[in-house]
């Protein structure tokens, strides 16, 4: 009995150390950013981390309250653990182009690596930096760890890349706001006036959609005028190649509309000029495309007629962690989800653990699974199809911003997820 009591006490102490509510920012952190750069490399079955550099940057744009992640989102996560007290003092989940590439046919034949950057507040004392990956069974496994000594003179303290920046919207304090750094990609020096106007327009598109609209006064919007030699991104399928600051390209993973950059080093070098919670790469083109990867970045074409719809859809991926709800053959990934595991995204389910998804939001008396018929249009139910899979995966409504460009608003389930992320980020 005494041993049991001791064990219970030890478990309670350990749980307290991991409690996000117990972490005081000023005790553990400076109001600066610790940036860890590395390569994520491997193939369809393996992943490895290759450390590249560690930097101390001028601005911390994130919250000073919600320091430990409470969502459990992302195919990867990083943690910062205070060495002396063994307290978990910061953590976040994230996604990566590397993880998406692992689900392509090419990953079965060769190895690749993708640049990755994690940012967190700069620790006052020695801390252990840990990267975990989520395996096929949905369980996090340690991938890499490294001791961060804030006195280490190999931690770079370089001046940020010389890029003109301006605050176009918002008056809030960085730690209590959602700071979005819009990075210019494919804009020449002569096109910077257009870039600033494009930022205001695209940001306006996102902030006109609920629940972002209701919290619009909690957003700070920055424009970073990173100059490219050429105008527009690469379009490999048309043999068009441009010299741009972030080397953005259509046809990522041979999907024509997938418009991305792999140059996260330069992207973060540019963004370091301002405090930021999320980076939005605005790409100067009238061709349809974009991308959004959770806690990685959001990108969007500036001038396509559907850029309004694409901007909010991709921001749903990048900032909130929402899944795609479509299930046609227009993507290049294979078996992206294990149907025996509940996906981490809040707006799709395999029914393995539906209780923690939108079960409480189901329309009273609705049939489950819910037929995709006119009778159930606009109702919250359990509709088969989502996450690129037509069978075994379910989504909340027949149509949503995360499924097609036909909807002006997110569905109730996605709106709830968006609001949770907004409130977490602003420290509420």
Each language-model region and where it sits:
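Bacterial Sec-dependent N-terminal signal peptides
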Residues: 1-24
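Beta-strand-enriched, solvent-exposed domains that form extended recognition/catalytic surfaces
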Residues: 28-153
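Fold-level signature of zinc-dependent metallopeptidase catalytic domains
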Residues: 154-210, 223-233, 252
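Solvent-exposed loop/turn segments at secondary-structure junctions
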Residues: 186-189, 227-230, 285-290, 305-307, ...
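Active-site-proximal segments of metallohydrolase catalytic domains
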Residues: 218-294
């Amino acid at each position: 009995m005494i041993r049991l009591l001791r064990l219970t006490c030890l478990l309670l102490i350990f749980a307290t150390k991991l409690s996000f509510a117990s972490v005081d920012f000023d005790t553990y952190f400076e109001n600066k950013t610790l940036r860890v750069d590395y390569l994520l490399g491997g193939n369809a079955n393996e992943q490895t981390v290759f450390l590249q550099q560690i930097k101390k940057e001028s601005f911390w744009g994130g919250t000073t309250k919600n320091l430990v992640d409470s969502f459990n989102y992302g195919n990867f996560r990083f943690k910062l653990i205070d060495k002396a007290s063994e307290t978990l003092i910061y953590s976040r989940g994230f996604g990566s182009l590397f993880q998406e590439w692992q689900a392509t046919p090419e990953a079965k034949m060769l190895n690749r690596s993708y640049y990755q950057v994690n940012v967190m507040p700069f620790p006052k004392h020695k801390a252990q930096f840990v990267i975990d990956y989520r395996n096929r069974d949905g369980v996090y496994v340690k991938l890499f760890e490294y001791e961060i000594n804030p006195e280490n003179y190999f931690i770079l303290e370089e001046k940020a890349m010389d890029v003109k920046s301006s605050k176009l919207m918002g008056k809030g304090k960085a730690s209590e706001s959602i700071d979005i750094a819009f990075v210019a990609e494919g804009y020449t020096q002569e096109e910077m006036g257009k870039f600033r106007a494009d930022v205001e327009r695209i940001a306006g598109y996102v902030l006109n959609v609920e629940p972002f609209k209701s919290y619009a006064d909690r957003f700070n919007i920055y424009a970073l005028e990173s100059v490219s030699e050429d105008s527009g991104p690469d379009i490999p399928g048309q043999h068009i190649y441009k010299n741009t600051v972030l080397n953005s390209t259509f046809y990522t993973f041979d999907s024509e509309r997938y418009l991305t950059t792999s140059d996260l080093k330069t992207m973060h070098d540019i963004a370091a000029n301002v405090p930021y919670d999320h980076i939005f790469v605005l790409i100067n083109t009238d061709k349809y495309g974009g991308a959004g990867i959770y806690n990685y970045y959001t990108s969007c074409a500036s001038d396509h007629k559907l850029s309004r719809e694409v901007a909010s859809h991709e921001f749903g991926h990048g900032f909130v962690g929402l899944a795609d709800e479509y299930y046609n053959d227009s993507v290049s990934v294979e078996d992206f989800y294990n149907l025996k595991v509940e996906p981490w995204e809040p707006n799709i389910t395999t029914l393995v653990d539906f209780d923690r998804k939108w079960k409480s939001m189901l329309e009273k008396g609705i049939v489950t699974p819910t037929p995709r018929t006119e009778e159930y249009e606009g109702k919250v139910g359990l509709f088969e199809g989502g996450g690129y899979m037509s069978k075994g995966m379910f989504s909340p409504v027949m149509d949503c911003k995360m499924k097609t460009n036909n909807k002006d608003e997110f569905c109730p389930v996605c709106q709830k997820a968006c609001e949770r992320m907004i409130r977490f980020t602003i420290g509420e």
